[in-house]
């Protein structure tokens, strides 16, 4: 089970730090599915394609982040639920 979260982040001068995050929904990822692909499908339901064209997915292992390409600001994340 993965946790899809909306992220509010602050720039600390060197990088982005999560200020708050809000649970959006639980996401089931089957063992035969790629979590990154499932995350992208969730992003497509959450944002318009025009907005997504300005974003990229960053894979940090247990956390996938949708980040704005120009600034690196995280806007949505999916992490393994504990």
Regions found by a protein language model. Give the residues of each.
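N-terminal acidic leader/helix
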Residues: 2-30
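A short, structured loop/turn motif at beta-sheet edges
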Residues: 31-35
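Short, mixed-charge low-complexity intrinsically disordered segments
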Residues: 45, 49-82
């Amino acid at each position: 089970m993965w946790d899809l979260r909306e992220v509010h982040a602050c720039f600390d001068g060197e990088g982005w730090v999560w200020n708050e995050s809000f649970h959006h929904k639980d996401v089931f990822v089957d063992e035969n599915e790629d979590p990154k692909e499932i995350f992208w499908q969730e992003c497509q339901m959450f944002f318009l394609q025009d907005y997504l064209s300005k974003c990229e997915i960053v894979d940090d292992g247990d956390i996938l982040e949708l980040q704005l390409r120009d600034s690196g600001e995280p806007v949505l994340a999916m992490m393994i639920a504990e």
